[in-house]
Amino acid sequence: MKTMKYILAALTVGGMMASCNTDIESLTIQRPLTYDDQYYQNLRDYKESDHEIAFGWFAQYGAQNSAAVRFMGLPDSLDICSMWGGIPSTENTEIWEEIRFVQKVKGTKMLCVAITRIDAETDDHAFKQAYNEAKAMPNGEERTAALNRSFEMYAEYFLDQVFLNDLDGFDADYEPEGDFLSGSNFEYFYKHMAKYMGPNPDITREERLQLIEERYGKEIASREGSCDKMLNIDQTSTSMTSLIPYSNYCFLQAYGGGTGAGGWPDEKVVYCCNMGDNWQGDMQSMYN
């Protein structure tokens, strides 16, 4: 009889445990705001209008554990986003879905960005191998031509990242710090990119379209905006004024304050402040 009592008790407890739902379910604490098609059309129209733009570098979007590190968490009013965290892998479909929504629906321009130092690149790249071989040549016209070709290959390396990933342009971070790709060499590199993007006065739209089609094929060349991608220089000073005609913007790293445009037109200079610095202060440097 005692045995039966123990068995019944065990069955009761087992039944109670079996009836518990142990599935982990996420709770919807706060639903994101949603907007209609007209809102997004108005947003895109605004970004196409003549206005003072909002620009920012964005990184750390690999975590996805907070709206603060997601593309959908970016302000709707942001005109241009420079993808400082790198280009996500194509397998990361969730991030790419957000990128495309922000890019195509909200109208935010997505830029590939890189610190352009050819000496710092690894030797496994074809452009770096060509560069190393060119540098080893004796001085003369052949060496200059070989170096220029390596700069073109380096430019094409970044062009591929923009066009193959359907991004909206390139942010060339010009901080040479002794790198060979500085001064006139950087200018040559930049102007080669300018054949494919940016406001190049030396090339017609038809010529640019032909170049894009020759390199990437008709499918990519026929995409909306393929001839209108942006080319920007990102620097700590207002040097390289020779590139003004080929640049949409100069992203000036004015982290310590100051708003001197140098020889650059005011409408092409975007003054940038690192909001992560001096976070305990009043951000007064943004307005000096």
Please name every model-derived segment.
Residues M1-I7:
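Bacterial N-terminal signal peptides that target proteins for export
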Residues G15-S19:
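C-terminal motif of bacterial Sec signal peptides marking the signal peptidase cleavage site
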Residues C20-N288:
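Secreted glycan hydrolases and related glycan-binding modules that recognize and/or cleave
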